Amino acid sequence: MSDCEEKIYSNDYVDFIISKDVLDVIDLSSDCIQRIDEEKDTYFYPRSFFRIFDFPADSYASVPKCYGLLDETALEVSGILKLQQQPALALKGQGVMIGFIDTGIDYRNPVFQYSDGTTRIYRIWDQTIRDGTKPEGIAYGSEYKTEQINAALRAENPLETVPSMDTNGHGTFVAGVACGSEDVEDNFIGAAPFSEIAVVKLKEAKTYLREFYFIPDSVPAYQENDIMMAVSYLDRLAKERDMPLVICIALGSNMGNRGKDGQLATYLDIVSRRRKRCSVAAVGNEANARHHFLGKIQPDMEYESVEVSVEENMPGFFIEMWANAPELYAVSVSSPTGEVLPKVPYRSGGRQEFVFIFEQTRVSIDYRLTGRRQGNQLIYLRFSNAAQGIWTINVYPQSIVTGDYNMWLPMRNFTSGNVFFLRSNPNHTITVPGNAGQVISTGGYNVANGGLYLDSGRGFTLSGEVKPDFCAPAVNVYGPGLRNRFVTMTGTLSLIHISEPTRQEAIS
């Protein structure tokens, strides 16, 4: 095992995503660098070198965000069967590669095989397996090719030959509904049953990031830089095969810049602009989570109060407040017992910590101007040992034009207790990267009544773009699970119905 590989997996090393334009103005070096593409790399440093917000580059943008799994008749209502059966079209995924970035795939399931029992999977890159053959140019994980998978399928114990396995079932379900082969007995067919399949099984986020973001141990979470590496890998595979590529991402996050400088969203936009490339992402299930606050300060207002309810004591949570340039704000915090952290004056790069005596809650406030293009303001509020009750954040205008700002709490499965805004707003609740301009984002509706799936994330984007682009069935979707069984799931995994219709866009 190489020294760099050990650093990629080790919790004693922190990961930073570095763009080429940062290197043009800041001299950075590391003895472990993983190339993502010509424009972006991941640098690895000992944890003792940097606190997360102390990195000399664009600190918060460089810190990998964590992404979680989005919750889980449909084909007929979507119009998929009409496309498959229309003689002039017969759209079933022929000549298209569909790539999945998720929890892996149960390659033994017959829905991922041809009628002769051979696999439809071109490659599996399993980031969690460290003792196999690594993909070219990548310092971690193990790659399994078609020939190896076919050999495994012929073996008495396939997992001894290809040990990659989806132990969660999420990735198998997504891939099956998107492109599973027909199973007449179980009345099932995927949207693109003749497509070629490529899979990346993501490794879990490092412990230091889970602790920083207060993500419960039992919840799957994945790092932004690993997802970006997966996108780069799939793009390279499609180049090798000279095939159109549709990238399916059933992951989402409330973390990071919702504008033009988010790392994953920006990278997906770059890849999706390339010929024969298309990216599809779900919009998430955050509309009714009460995790978004839309602020508006009028010129005659001294401040606006934002109330956050913490229903039980919890290890912690964080709030990201974003304002578009040239807006600038400052904040103060009041505890449930009335103790006040006075207004922290705005200073870019400034940070203040305060421990509330009665609650024993530690609150840290970081001010940042983010991105090298826009300079949008981020105020990052982190509550450790969060006490039960109503916490109040007073937002003070420092320099305003519109008076608009937004706050987001983490996705609901990334919090260990019930925390929400008392005056929440369901708009702007599309999870990243579903807000990216070049990514096809899909919301969900209920087939039974034709109504919108109420939890489905809602637009617009902060730049005013219309999102989601499509809606598809999201309630009781039928698809393959583990152990060759079929299951139903609910949520904006509706993106999987969009994969075959978008292949025409990928081809063109």
Please name every model-derived segment:
Residues 86-223, 315, 326-327, 436-438, ...:
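Subtilisin-like serine protease catalytic core
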Residues 125, 130, 138-145, 289-377, ...:
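Extracellular S/T/G-rich loop segment that most often corresponds to the catalytic His/Ser-adjacent loop
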Residues 229-259, 282, 398:
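Short acidic, glycine-rich surface-loop motifs adjacent to enzyme active sites
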Residues 264-294:
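Catalytic cores of secreted or luminal carbohydrate-active enzymes
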Residues 496-497, 504-507:
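Single conserved hydrophobic/aromatic residue that forms the stacking wall/gate
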